[in-house]
Amino acid sequence: MNTIKEGQNFKAVDFGSIEKLIDYELPMGPDVLKGKVFGGQAVCATGSEFSFQTLVPGQDGGFLHSHKTHEELYFILRGEGEYQVDGEVFPIREGSVIRVCPDGKRCIRNNGTENLTMLCIQYKANTFGADDNPMTDGNILQEPLNW
């Protein structure tokens, strides 16, 4: 992963191509989880965490898990598989988005014939209220673009 550019209000990082995400390794105790990388700290995120993960055909997440306070959004970027939440199993594929509350017992598996790649975003649950509409929070500025 390489820093592209950073400034007072931003940091941009390159994780490489989707095909190369499989090369990342995440230490988990005595084991190493291949194909997963966290990125929130790399971009200095202050309100969320995110990870990319690639599962090869036949691979699953390895274990059910839940969270204490984090809700998760899973974006399936490539491939197909199945997702399990609280014992419910359903098909997923490129373009699927899954939201799971902190208490949801979850896992993913690739039952397809090609790699499955996803983006997972974690953030504290129940932090957005009725007044947190993205259309009213944004400010359209009357400044020129500097392309």
Task: Tell where the protein language model's regions lie, with residue ranges.
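Short acidic-glycine-tyrosine-enriched beta hairpin
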Residues: 87-103
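Short beta-strand His + acidic residue motifs that chelate non-heme Fe in jelly-roll/DSBH
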Residues: 63, 83-84, 100, 106-112
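Short strand-coil-strand connectors
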Residues: 46, 84-88
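Double-stranded beta-helix
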Residues: 107-147
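Short, conserved beta-strand element in jelly-roll/cupin
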Residues: 52-56, 66-84, 121-123
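Short, charged/polar surface micro-motifs in flexible loops or helix N-caps
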Residues: 44-48, 56-60, 80, 124-127
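A short, N-terminal "cap"/entry segment at the start of jelly-roll beta-barrel domains
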Residues: 1-47, 133-147
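Conserved short histidine dyad/triad with adjacent acidic residue
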Residues: 32-38, 51-67
